[in-house]
């Protein structure tokens, strides 16, 4: 009898279907390794799977070697929390260090993108290369897992061999944007227990179980940077090259510390304002001119220089693993938490698409991901190469 047989949650019983003895017995033959991050979502995911009868074990992975960064890196505290949750649930916690793989497959790419003037999203690459690749392989080969599970707010449908990725039920927390680069094979080997409910339900279950992570705040920002200033972190790895800030007319109105510190559509932190002969409208970054090391800015949120009618995306990944062969009418997100944009996606070749928005959009940022949806289903996406004006 596991500890969780003694632990109970009224909220769990209310939101999750009760399985028959037959279903529980079937699930009892299946081993699931849960990625325990030390957060509330993975904690409750482990409990849900236990309640559903699976053989559950946890795996905590470390992806970053802190040197003197203990103030910023929460790895030790997260491991302690993950261990406390596993002890309470009565499950085993394995540990693995993927710092080398992370550096080689995620961090080096992150730096090279910044060097090239783009704004990358390392979380997407981490999911593709580490959580659903290195982690998945280790869980299957070394720990004998039939599936892995994570605390992501997404859902899956279809059989394992033809799995589809869907948005999480909680629209506010949906994380399909970050998982769009997974293949149907990776989705088919994964379970997402909290994707079927809202975040408030997850917190309530954790409270009722008395889990140490119940009130822990969600992690935000890039995992290897933690709470520290992004600028300071980047400066340790990439030398900054200060240069001019110019208006779209070519007038120099200030200096920047380095193009890599700025992103398209940015308004704050430009250090310009109250310029003689200019109105009070806020300044926005509209271009990063790498060749001349110039940051180009324009005034006003609705300035046409900020807008684009579409984008070109490359490095495409489709969950179905089938390249796009004909024009697709769907919706796209060009950043996380954005409202879906109706669009037309035109294949140029297997690795490039042109995306035409129904309405012009602002701050479409090279290096970020364009992610495509058909209703609830996340189809895949690519890296934004350039805007179409």
From Swiss-Prot:
Disulfide bonds: 126-223
Main location: cytoplasm
GO molecular function ontology, one term from the record: tRNA binding
Region of interest (Interaction with tRNA), ranges: 173-175, 335-336
Region (Interaction with target base in tRNA): 121-123
SUPFAM superfamilies: Adenine nucleotide alpha hydrolases-like (SSF52402)
Positions that bind ATP: 35-42, 61, 151
Keyword entries, A-Z: ATP-binding, Cytoplasm, Disulfide bond, Nucleotide-binding, RNA-binding, Transferase, tRNA processing, tRNA-binding
Class of this enzyme: transferase
Subcellular localization(s) per the UniProt record: Cytoplasm
UniProt record, GO biological process: tRNA wobble position uridine thiolation
Gene Ontology cellular component annotations, sorted alphabetically: cytoplasm
Annotated site residue numbers, Interaction with tRNA: 152, 368
Catalyzed reactions: S-sulfanyl-L-cysteinyl-[protein] + uridine(34) in tRNA + AH2 + ATP = 2-thiouridine(34) in tRNA + L-cysteinyl-[protein] + A + AMP + diphosphate + H(+)
Record EC number: 2.8.1.13
Catalytic residues of the enzyme: 126, 223
Protein family (similarity comment): Belongs to the MnmA/TRMU family.
Function: Catalyzes the 2-thiolation of uridine at the wobble position (U34) of tRNA, leading to the formation of s(2)U34.
Protein name as it appears in the record: tRNA-specific 2-thiouridylase MnmA
Organism: Actinobacillus succinogenes (strain ATCC 55618 / DSM 22257 / CCUG 43843 / 130Z)
């Amino acid at each position: 009898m596991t500890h969780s047989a003694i632990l109970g949650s009224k909220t769990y019983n209310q939101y999750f279907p009760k399985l028959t003895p037959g279903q529980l017995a079937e699930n009892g033959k299946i081993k699931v390794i849960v990625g325990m991050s030390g957060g509330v979502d993975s904690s409750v995911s482990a409990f849900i799977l236990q309640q559903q009868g699976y053989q559950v074990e946890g795996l905590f992975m470390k992806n970053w070697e802190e040197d003197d960064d203990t103030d910023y890196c929460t790895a030790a505290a997260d491991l302690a929390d993950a261990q406390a949750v596993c002890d309470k649930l009565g499950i085993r916690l394995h540990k693995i260090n993927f710092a080398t793989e992370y550096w080689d497959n995620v961090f080096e790419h992150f730096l090279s993108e910044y060097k090239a003037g783009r704004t990358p999203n390392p979380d997407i690459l981490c999911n593709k290369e580490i959580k659903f690749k290195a982690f998945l392989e280790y869980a299957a080969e070394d720990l004998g897992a039939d599936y892995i599970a994570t605390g992501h707010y997404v859902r899956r449908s279809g059989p394992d061999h033809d799995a589809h990725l869907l948005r999480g039920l909680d629209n506010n927390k949906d994380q399909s944007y970050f998982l769009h680069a997974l293949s149907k094979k990776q989705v088919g080997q994964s379970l997402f227990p909290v994707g079927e409910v809202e975040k408030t339900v997850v917190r309530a279950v954790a409270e009722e179980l008395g889990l140490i992570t119940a009130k822990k705040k969600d992690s935000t920002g890039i995992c290897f940077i933690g709470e520290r200033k992004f600028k300071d972190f980047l400066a340790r790895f990439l030398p900054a090259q200060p240069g001019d800030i110019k208006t779209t007319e070519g007038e120099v109105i200030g200096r920047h510390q380095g193009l890599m510190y700025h992103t398209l559509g940015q308004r704050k932190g430009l250090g310009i304002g109250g310029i003689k002969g200019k109105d009070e409208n806020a300044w926005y970054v509209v271009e990063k001119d790498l060749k001349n090391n110039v940051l180009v800015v324009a005034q006003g949120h609705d300035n046409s220089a900020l807008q684009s009618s579409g984008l070109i995306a490359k490095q495409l990944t489709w969950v179905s693993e089938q390249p796009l062969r004909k024009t697709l009418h769907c919706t796209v997100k060009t950043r996380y938490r954005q409202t879906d944009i109706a669009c037309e996606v035109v294949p140029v070749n297997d690795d490039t698409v042109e995306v035409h928005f129904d309405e012009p959009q602002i701050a479409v940022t090279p290096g970020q991901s364009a992610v495509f949806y058909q209703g609830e289903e996340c189809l895949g996406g690519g890296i934004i190469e350039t805007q179409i004006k």
